[in-house]
Amino acid sequence: MSLLNDIPLTALHFYLTAPYACSYLPDLQARSQVATPAVLIGTPVYSELVQHGFRRSGAYTYRPHCDDCRACVPLRVPAEQFTASRSQRRAWAQHAHLQASLHPLLDSAEHYELYQRYQRARHPNGGMDNDDCESYQNFLLQSQVDSLLVEFREQGVLRMVSVIDLLSDGLSSVYTFYEPDLPRARFGVYNVLWQIELCRKLDLDFVYLGYWIKHSRKMAYKTGYRPAQGLIDGIWQPLGKEFITKDAHGNL
């Protein structure tokens, strides 16, 4: 049993939200199961919750719990078993010159400006493209667990920012945003590979990539990191070849 200052995991309460519009599959209603109180969810407790399919948004810890849909599959990559595809190796080489630096969660006008441009370019009309500074801070800079912020720069120019949670058995990729105006760049792919490499250096087992949704183009890429494991019917199990997703160029 996980403990946080001698507080058992069973001290948490779980409730279901009211139905709301699904962010990933059109015309569907979603619900979430939320763990509370947030003050009790430190790193040990959160690590166990992640193993059961939970994620966090700021201090809000949840997992999908929809009435008639099970499309959201928690996904993780075993770091030591991971083998990069040819396309992924090209992305790694393309951006190997980026300089990464690790920081505590920090509020930065430079980060926020990049976040706004990323949202407007990559997720227009998705709701987050109009996030004000307070919404951004609540989403990415509020954390009850061990978190870090990673800057990626190219000759001093900020290209990408990633927020990562440190778990007992791995890393949880919270969110990444990057320069959207370099169309040939493959920052997102490079970032996942960088996190897998960091996981190996820290001698941790898994990189948790959030939810995979087969029919959501925004989420489908995650099965391209092989081997991938999905939490299905409460059991982490390998996702077979039928789950492998190609990108828009036909690359794995």
Annotate the PLM regions.
Residues 171, 179-186, 202-207, 211-215:
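Nucleic-acid nuclease catalytic cores
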Residues 49, 115, 192-195, 222:
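Residue-level preference for non-acidic, small/hydrophobic
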Residues 55-68, 74-184, 224:
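A conserved beta-strand-loop-helix scaffold within acyl/acetyltransferase catalytic domains
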Residues 52, 193-205:
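Conserved acyl-CoA
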Residues 165, 190-193, 210:
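Active-site scaffold segments
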Residues 184-196:
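Conserved acetyl-CoA-binding loop-helix of GNAT-fold acetyltransferases
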Residues 1-104, 205-252:
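Terminal substrate-recognition subdomain of acyl/acetyltransferases
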